[in-house]
A protein has these predicted regions:
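ADP-ribose/NAD+-binding catalytic cleft of ART/PARP-like enzymes
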Residues: 1-31, 48
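Active-site and NAD+-binding cores of ADP-ribose-processing enzymes
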Residues: 3-8, 15-18, 58-173
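Short active-site loop/helix that positions an aromatic residue
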Residues: 41-54
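Residues that flank catalytic or metal-binding motifs in active/ligand-binding sites
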Residues: 30-33, 58
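Active-site nucleophile-adjacent alpha helix/oxyanion-hole segment immediately C-terminal to the catalytic cysteine
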Residues: 35-38
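Short, solvent-exposed loop/turn segments at secondary-structure junctions
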Residues: 11, 41-43, 129
């Protein structure tokens, strides 16, 4: 299935990207991947609250083929496999190594030996801090859906849509 998705990137000047940049942070939910939002509103919100170093962010539009993705949002079987895999690995770490599984260890294991080895990416629901997702206090009624893309060949196009201001400052001025 082809999905229209949005990639948020910190704006570092007038030159726009020709392809997305992979996130390589150890605390990224699915480790090293190209992260996309399913909603342009979520992409803009992420830019405003997290892309603060330059005071601006760019939003790019892409078509992503998600046929071989693990869909933890809309596919119940995929969700149950994902949930069970996490719980088994966390328990194994606790019982055999006597420690809690870190996010980095989970992602490294799944990419090298487990669940993510045979998929092109993951569709997942993020927890939102955007007040527009909470019309009723305490109830997130809108899903904030992201894609973590492992196989960049599934990204069919990459087009700059707009630049906007974040809630930050420009440290390069």
């Amino acid at each position: 299935m082809d999905r229209i998705c949005y990639h948020t990137q910190e704006c570092r000047g007038t030159e726009k990207l020709g392809k997305p940049i992979a996130c390589k942070r150890d605390d990224a939910w699915f480790g090293e991947a190209y992260y996309f939002w399913e909603s342009i509103e979520d992409s803009d919100f992420w830019g405003k609250v997290s892309k603060k170093a330059t005071g601006k962010y760019d939003v790019y539009k892409s078509t992503v083929n998600s046929n071989d993705f693990l869909d933890t949002v809309f596919n119940e079987q995929h969700y149950k496999v994902w949930l069970s895999s996490i719980e088994k690995l966390a328990l194994k770490f606790k019982m055999e190594l006597g420690k809690e599984l870190s996010l980095k260890e989970l992602n490294d294991y799944f990419k090298n030996k487990g669940l993510y080895k045979s998929v092109d990416g993951v569709v997942f629901q993020d927890i939102s801090s955007n007040e527009s997702h909470y019309l009723i206090k305490g109830m997130q009624y809108k899903k904030r859906i992201q894609l973590a893309v492992f196989n960049k060949l599934t990204i069919k196009d990459f087009v700059h849509l707009h630049t906007d201001k974040s809630y930050g400052y420009d440290r390069y001025k």
